[in-house]
From Swiss-Prot:
Subcellular location(s) of the protein: Cytoplasm
Gene Ontology biological process terms, A to Z: histidyl-tRNA aminoacylation; L-histidine biosynthetic process
GO CC annotations on file: cytoplasm
Subunit details: Heteromultimer composed of HisG and HisZ subunits.
Name of the protein this chain belongs to: ATP phosphoribosyltransferase regulatory subunit
Family: Belongs to the class-II aminoacyl-tRNA synthetase family. HisZ subfamily.
GO molecular function, one term: histidine-tRNA ligase activity
Gene name of this polypeptide: hisZ
């Protein structure tokens, strides 16, 4: 028996102080976005399953249309927004910077509120990353900023005959058993660690390690951690990637990616996690 006060597992309820905080977070982000020439986009909650990236993903909430087309509830706004901008909006607008405030959904009943920014054709991740950092700072939050480069684990796997799954599973124990540069990469945390590693790194890694260092130089943030071997959680992040976290909670993540053959960069703020952090 389902009681009247019960809610589906994974759904979200905000009221009073939590609802006010949620609105304050959104207002803070909106102000920052407009000041940086971003425009808002609201995408449909439903999309054809074939447009959802991995149509075999079991976490997508599925249903059928009246014409028997497979439909999915929005699972990833980055994919949706960039597809709509490149295939539909660009017929009438050449604007490149877009932001959104809307939830995504996953099976069976999980709802995740997000605030995101996407810079279509953005070549440098640094300004986008700094925008995300500044929004959380305005909210008086000081999470750790962790920066990585997905090209580094792929290069290491290629040149060391190590299965990429070792990096994907973050098998630190196995990586530390390897001699030379691999163990050095695991120990990198600070800017000084990274600068030192660049001096002794193999030639095939130097450029990507330097790009990792350069990415952070644009945004001086005290609580910055470098993690060259960190594996990004989203498959379309294949380059520079960053996240901001407190404890086990990720408040923001983003990076450089390619969607619909367009190289872009962006980030998403996880509103639910930020609200919880502000309430604690």
């Amino acid at each position: 028996m389902i009681l009247e006060h019960e809610l589906p597992q994974g759904s979200k309820l905000y009221f009073d102080m939590s609802a006010r905080l949620k609105r304050d977070i959104e207002s803070c982000a909106i102000k920052a976005f407009y000041e940086n020439d971003y425009r808002e986009i609201v995408t449909p909650s439903f999309a054809f399953l074939e447009h959802q990236g991995d149509m075999f993903n079991r976490e997508i909430v599925r249903l059928s249309s009246e014409n028997n087309h497979q439909i999915g509830l929005r699972y990833d706004t980055t994919l949706d927004a960039m597809r709509i901008v490149t295939k539909r909006i660009m017929r009438s607008s050449t604007h490149k910077k877009w932001f959104y405030i809307q939830p995504v959904f996953s099976y069976p009943t999980t709802e995740i509120h997000q605030i995101g920014a996407e810079y279509l054709g953005g070549e440098s991740l640094s300004p986008v990353m700094c925008l995300g950092v500044s929004i959380l700072q305005t909210l008086n939050l000081a999470p750790y900023l962790q920066i990585s480069n997905m090209k580094i684990p792929f290069l290491c796997a290629k040149h060391s005959d190590v299965d990429i799954e070792v990096f994907a599973l973050q098998n630190v124990g196995k990586l530390l058993q390897m001699e030379g540069y691999m163990a050095d990469l695991v120990h990198i945390k600070t800017k000084q660690d990274l600068q030192k590693a660049i001096l002794s790194a193999p030639a095939f890694l130097k450029e990507e390690l330097e790009r990792l260092l350069e990415c952070a130089s644009y945004c001086e943030y005290e609580k910055t951690i470098f993690s060259p071997l960190l594996f990004a959680p989203s498959p379309y992040y294949e380059d520079l990637f960053f996240r901001m976290f407190v404890g086990n909670s990720t408040l923001l993540q983003g990076g450089k990616y390619s969607v619909e053959e367009q190289f872009s960069c962006g980030f998403a703020i996880y509103t639910d996690e930020v609200v919880e952090c502000l309430l604690s």
